Amino acid sequence: MVLTARQRDELNQAIHQYLLISYQQSAQLFKTEAAVKDGQIEADLLEKKWNSIVRLSKRVITLEQQVEQLNEQLAQAQAGKIQFNKSDDEQRLTPIEKFKLEGHRAGVNCVAFHPQYQILGSASDDGSIKLWDYESGHFEKTLKGHTSNVNCLAFDPTGKYICSASSDLSIKIWELKNHTCVKTLIGHEHSVSTVQFSDHGDFILSASRDKNIKLWEVATGFCKKTFSEHQEWVRCAVFSNDEKQIASCSQDQMIYIWVIDSGQVLHQLSGHEHVVEQVKYIPEHGAKQILTQQQQQNIQTINLLVSVSRDKEIKIWNTILGTNLFTLSGHDNWVNGVSFHPDGVHMLSVSDDKTIRVWNLKEQKQKKKIENAHDKFILKCEINKFIFATCSVDQTIKLWLLS
């Protein structure tokens, strides 16, 4: 077996930690022969490695079972024993509750999936960030440092860092390896609503109740640009798929599309009749399917935007033309968040009406409704492949299985 230098060092550290428990002389000899340095030794490394092996083993078993089931279904389909219909599709899209995560002492405002590992982060009005193993449902760690509500969090693309936005006016960058805050970004003059890393992790985008949007350089912690046009609290700001533009939404009921290089507003999108809570760009493969359905194949952009509002509506926008493609109605209270199914066609939304709704964006229809998904208002949701996470004022996070 060939190990990288880093893997070899970590293995030697783990062996040394094990020997220290009962075999001190052997540990000292091994430390000398393996050249384990005191500064290298990371606390609980052996336990972390062992837990990783256990989790990976469980994951392998689960995947093997899924492969076996899929092979059986494939064999039956090839033999003509399975007939697929629309009801099968609707059944496939039904979220099935897997875990209920409890531990926060106040409402949970945000959830975020690690880009590589089976870690879910949650942010709460109790001022803490919690990390969970979403495969087992086990609590892992609490990050403390903010002095007020934590409103949003996001992982960087490498998974090494997590950033958090708080009502204490700050943004914090945390190193996951040591669970420590390595940088605090100061510049907003009111609560920070949302944060997002750029695709390469070089920049962080933030939105604030001070009516401003800021672009931060991660390496230096300096604010590179401020975008100011909104008249009220900016609820959310996100990068476009090509990262040439920014979309923002506000308590002023407006959505702005900004050109990052110039800092100018390209479009002002109006149509919502109440506070716009969130905007999200539709993934490229989904946007292409919608444009094809809309017979707009000649449009070169794939920057389609979804907005959700307290007016109970969800709107889909073409951000190049600055036009509303269509509106989805059905929720009975404020709509707070959306996430996109991996197939690119379906979208899930959450609301103060305590429901989860599944939408087909090509058909512009609601396909499924899950009643009383939480005991109180559902604030946000995220999808990682076929795991769907929701968070609520009821202080809990729920994990749902999708297929």
From Swiss-Prot:
Protein name: Lissencephaly-1 homolog 1
Key word Nucleus present: no
The entry's keywords: Cell cycle, Cell division, Coiled coil, Cytoplasm, Cytoskeleton, Microtubule, Mitosis, Repeat, Transport, WD repeat
Pfam families with a match to the protein in the record: WD40
Mapped WD repeat ranges: 103-142, 145-184, 187-226, 229-270, 271-327, 330-369, 373-403
Compartments reported by the entry: Cytoplasm, Cytoskeleton; Cytoplasm, Cytoskeleton, Microtubule organizing center, Centrosome
Role: Positively regulates the activity of the minus-end directed microtubule motor protein dynein. May enhance dynein-mediated microtubule sliding by targeting dynein to the microtubule plus end. Required for several dynein- and microtubule-dependent processes.
InterPro entries tied to this protein: Dynein_regulator_LIS1, G-protein_beta_WD-40_rep, LIS1_N, LisH, WD40/YVTN_repeat-like_dom_sf, WD40_repeat_CS, WD40_repeat_dom_sf, WD40_rpt
GO molecular function, one term: dynein complex binding
Source taxonomy: Eukaryota, Sar, Alveolata, Ciliophora, Intramacronucleata
